[in-house]
């Protein structure tokens, strides 16, 4: 169970209520809060990246830490590594995430987008891109289609690092696709080792991550832009002399 605090940018009103809200969550065992600040200005006058905004974001994270609550911050300031001081800051948006696919008239993010952000926004820390879209047609905008595939949505859980993953689709769409959804529910979010066997910014990327602990399991995500291609995956990072069983999710050849 995750609490959602959408402030609409009115942070002074939020600060007047936040401690009571966090106390309520603590009493009921709610351990995660997703905050939001939709709007160009905070309190109608301050930029998100202003001193006013930075102090507010830190205040929320500090208070949440005191209540043992984790934060997923949307519409944040530029990531600065604050999660090193406050590890309850699990992840942040700060990226043109998958929500754009829901309302953009051109179908949202183009396939090339996710081959770029691991090397730009991804360098600044965990990002909540909200992968996991299983239905690609939009009845609200019937002329559009989300520019992705089911296999790519699963791969993004590995390619885009976030210790807290938020799946983006409706429950009914997951119930209709139980096998791929099981990948989302079992894919780790913290890793012991990460390597990049093959990548070219804006074209393709393959990322392999080893699950933390003693399982020895590796998870590999591989994505491309609009162009189909065959990619090489050297497996030299696997333990020599050990046998592995692979479960592979793959897109149709005509999709990306």
Predicted regions and their residues:
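Aromatic- and carboxylate-enriched substrate-binding clefts and catalytic-loop regions
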Residues: 1-139, 143-149
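Acidic/polar loop patches that form or flank catalytic/metal-binding clefts of enzymes
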Residues: 68-75, 100-102, 165-174, 193-195, ...
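Conserved, mostly hydrophobic/aromatic
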Residues: 71, 159, 220
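Catalytic cores of secreted or luminal carbohydrate-active enzymes
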Residues: 151, 155-197
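Residue-level detector of conserved catalytic or cofactor/ligand-binding positions
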Residues: 246-256
């Amino acid at each position: 169970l995750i609490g959602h605090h959408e402030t609409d940018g009115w942070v002074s009103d939020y600060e007047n209520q936040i401690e009571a809200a966090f106390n309520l969550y603590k009493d009921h065992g709610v351990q995660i809060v997703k905050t939001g600040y939709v709007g160009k200005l905070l309190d109608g006058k301050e930029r998100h990246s202003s001193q006013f905004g930075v102090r507010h974001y830190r205040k929320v994270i500090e208070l949440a830490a005191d209540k043992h609550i984790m934060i997923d911050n949307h519409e944040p300031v530029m990531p600065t590594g604050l999660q090193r001081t406050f590890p309850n800051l699990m992840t942040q948006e700060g990226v043109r995430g998958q929500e754009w696919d829901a309302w953009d008239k051109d179908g949202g993010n183009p396939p090339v987008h996710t081959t770029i952000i691991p090397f730009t926004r991804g360098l600044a820390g965990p990002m909540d891109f909200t992968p996991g879209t299983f239905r690609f047609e939009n009845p609200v905008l019937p002329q559009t289609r989300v520019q992705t595939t089911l296999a790519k949505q699963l791969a993004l859980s590995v390619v885009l690092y976030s210790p807290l993953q938020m799946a983006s689709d409706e429950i009914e769409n997951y119930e209709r696709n139980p096998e791929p959804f099981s990948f989302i529910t079992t894919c780790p979010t913290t890793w012991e080792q990460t390597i990049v066997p093959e990548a070219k910014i804006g074209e393709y990327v393959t990322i392999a991550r080893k699950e933390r602990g003693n399982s020895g399991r590796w998870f590999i995500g591989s994505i491309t832009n609009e162009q189909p291609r065959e990619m090489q995956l050297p497996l030299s990072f696997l333990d020599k002399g050990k046998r592995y069983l692979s479960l592979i999710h793959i897109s149709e050849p005509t999709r990306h």
